[in-house]
């Protein structure tokens, strides 16, 4: 019997089972212990293969692929700390609803806890973050193939969001020619090999439930809060709120068109919050709210009912309102809860939103990051998409811009880390094939710098704007101690990205004014390659501009 041959047949069953659950994209890092999985994936024509040498970036690449495809994405890594590098992407997927399947190769049990190389305790290492964890046994013909495939099917058939961890120990030898070992073991699955359905089908019942008193509540004074959702859902939510006559407070990730723009500015005005106090019901569609003033209002508002509608399970209200947590697809829920045409009940807020936007426009000429955030809608590629980084940049865009309704926007706003942002953007572009504008800060770019290797492989123009404000300037918005702020919070690195782009053979520009930036963008959208645009700005201007606008709008 050939151990290496049976390892591969065992792995082939695992990989084939994944295809029955919609897995098409598979991300592979180099490694020896994962050889059976890698070769099985390489031989399966159902997969689109992606490779990367950094497992942390690989996990985020998979995250980006899953965001766009809405399908589970598989990841293959070798044993040891390679597995631990998948933790950040797994955590993010659990919070934002993407489906990841982590296939982690492992040493066999006799090599654990005995000083063997690259052998750590992998089963259960992700604690409660996966929705399902499987610790497979060492491949053996004593275990029927139907057990293996039904075990995989059970985990994936009930996967609605988040990650599945499948730990796969393999004994040596890992290499060798294929022989007849294990053929009869595989063949006991019969015509499953020619089918395209799971061996075991488990479909959890998830049907939106109609709120029987909706006809009553839709006649009341309501507010719609729109969080993270799809582009198509964003357009439907905007129309729904408009029909009801309810004010819509749209997050940067809502894709609603933000009909009341600059919400994170005007929510700091007492006239706005006073008018919102008249609301009898708040319906929040989607989670992961960005704006600080929005979160403050959300925490302090006290309507008679607060409903949160999101496809993700669990508690999504840090303010713990009395109300309803409705687990449903947003589009399906809207269909079950039609709007009734009513006149808008808010008078003050539309005026404040218009005045706030005019205040922003009055400052748009200076060459800075706040102004870039406001102008970003002018720079979006046609039929494209936007990927927004975390920290200060996403808050500026949320507060100062008005993105088009239905224009796809992606971000990692679950755990809101700055790790893996370039890798996630690469996955977003690959899965969609669309022109992509990505915008991140300098520390975020440094954190994921080797992901520039992934950006060499794009199928449409990708522009990466790195806003270089020399450190974590978001801490300028917080009451951090001035004497320790620069060293312990901002951590300026005094670097530029020209040589990094050159190392990965990417086009690079550092415009000094808006005309140069716009000329660079026109050229960049013409070719299916990556262009790195470094926008060097004054360290504190972005944060100061936001603070000045907040003060100005609060006194309107």
UniProtKB/Swiss-Prot annotation:
NCBIfam families: menD. This is 2-succinyl-5-enolpyruvyl-6-hydroxy-3-cyclohexene-1-carboxylate synthase. Pathway: Quinol/quinone metabolism; 1,4-dihydroxy-2-naphthoate biosynthesis; 1,4-dihydroxy-2-naphthoate from chorismate: step 2/7; Quinol/quinone metabolism; menaquinone biosynthesis. Belongs to the TPP enzyme family. MenD subfamily. Transmembrane segments: none annotated. Binds 1 thiamine pyrophosphate per subunit. It comes from the Bacteria. It catalyses: isochorismate + 2-oxoglutarate + H(+) = 5-enolpyruvoyl-6-hydroxy-2-succinyl-cyclohex-3-ene-1-carboxylate + CO2. Catalyzes the thiamine diphosphate-dependent decarboxylation of 2-oxoglutarate and the subsequent addition of the resulting succinic semialdehyde-thiamine pyrophosphate anion to isochorismate to yield 2-succinyl-5-enolpyruvyl-6-hydroxy-3-cyclohexene-1-carboxylate (SEPHCHC). PANTHER family: 2-SUCCINYL-5-ENOLPYRUVYL-6-HYDROXY-3-CYCLOHEXENE-1-CARBOXYLATE SYNTHASE, PROTEIN PHYLLO, CHLOROPLASTIC. Keywords: Magnesium, Manganese, Menaquinone biosynthesis, Metal-binding, Thiamine pyrophosphate, Transferase. CDD domains: TPP_PYR_MenD, TPP_SHCHC_synthase. GO terms for molecular function: 2-succinyl-5-enolpyruvyl-6-hydroxy-3-cyclohexene-1-carboxylic-acid synthase activity; magnesium ion binding; manganese ion binding; thiamine pyrophosphate binding. Pfam families: TPP_enzyme_C, TPP_enzyme_M_2, TPP_enzyme_N. Homodimer. It comes from Escherichia coli O127:H6 (strain E2348/69 / EPEC). Its cofactor is Mg(2+); Mn(2+); thiamine diphosphate. GO terms for biological process: menaquinone biosynthetic process. Its EC number is 2.2.1.9.
């Amino acid at each position: 019997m050939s151990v290496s041959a049976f390892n591969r047949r065992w792995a082939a069953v695992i990989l084939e089972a994944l295809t029955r659950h919609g897995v098409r994209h598979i991300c592979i890092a180099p490694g020896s212990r994962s050889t059976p999985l890698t070769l099985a994936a390489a031989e399966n024509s159902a997969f689109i293969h992606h490779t990367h040498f950094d497992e942390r970036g690989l996990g985020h690449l998979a995250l980006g692929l899953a965001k766009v495809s809405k399908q589970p994405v598989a990841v293959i890594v070798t044993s040891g700390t390679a597995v631990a590098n998948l933790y950040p992407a797994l955590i993010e997927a659990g919070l934002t609803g993407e489906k990841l399947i982590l296939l982690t190769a492992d040493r066999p049990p006799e090599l654990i806890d005995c000083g063997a190389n690259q052998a750590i305790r992998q089963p259960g290492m992700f604690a409660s973050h996966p929705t399902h964890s499987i610790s497979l046994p060492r491949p053996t013909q004593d275990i029927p193939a139907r057990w293996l495939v039904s075990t995989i099917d059970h985990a994936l058939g009930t996967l609605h969001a988040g990650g599945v961890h499948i730990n796969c120990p393999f004994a040596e030898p890992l290499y060798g020619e294929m022989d007849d070992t294990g053929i009869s073991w595989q063949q006991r699955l019969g015509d499953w090999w020619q089918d395209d359905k799971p061996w075991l089908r488990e479909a959890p019942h998830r049907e939106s439930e109609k709120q029987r008193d909706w006809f009553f509540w839709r006649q009341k004074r309501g507010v719609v809060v729109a969080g993270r959702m799809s582009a198509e859902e964003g357009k439907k939510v905007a129309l729904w709120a408009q029909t009801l006559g309810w004010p819509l407070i749209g997050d940067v990730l809502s894709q609603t068109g933000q009909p009341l723009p600059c919400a994170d500015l005007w929510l700091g005005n007492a006239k706005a919050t006073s008018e919102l106090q008249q609301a009898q019901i708040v319906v929040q569609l989607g989670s992961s709210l960005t704006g600080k003033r929005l979160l403050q209002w959300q925490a302090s508002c006290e309507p008679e009912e607060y409903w949160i509608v999101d496809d993700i399970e669990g508690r999504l209200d840090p303010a713990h309102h009395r109300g309803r947590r409705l687990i449903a697809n947003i589009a399906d829920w809207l269909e079950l809860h039609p709007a009734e045409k009513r006149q808008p009940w808010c008078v003050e807020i539309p005026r404040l939103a218009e005045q706030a936007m005019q205040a922003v426009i009055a400052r748009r000429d200076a060459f800075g990051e706040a102004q870039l955030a406001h102008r970003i809608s002018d720079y979006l590629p046609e039929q494209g998409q936007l990927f927004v980084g975390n920290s200060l940049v996403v808050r500026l865009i949320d507060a100062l811009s008005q993105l088009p309704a239905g224009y796809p926007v992606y971000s990692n706003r679950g755990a809101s880390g700055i790790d893996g942002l370039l890798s996630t953007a690469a996955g977003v572009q690959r899965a969609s094939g669309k022109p992509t504008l990505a915008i991140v800060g300098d520390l975020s770019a440094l954190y994921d710098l080797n992901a520039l290797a992934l950006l060499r492989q794009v199928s449409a123009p990708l522009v990466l704007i790195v806003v270089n404000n020399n450190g974590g300037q978001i801490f300028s918005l917080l009451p951090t101690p001035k004497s320790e702020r620069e060293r312990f919070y901002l951590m300026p690195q005094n670097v530029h990205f020209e040589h990094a782009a050159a190392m990965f053979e990417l086009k690079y520009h550092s415009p000094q004014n808006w005309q140069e930036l716009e000329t660079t963008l026109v050229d960049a959208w013409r070719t299916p390659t990556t262009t790195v645009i470094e926008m060097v700005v004054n360290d504190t201007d972005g944060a100061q501009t936001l603070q000045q606008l907040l003060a100005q709008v609060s006194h309107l």
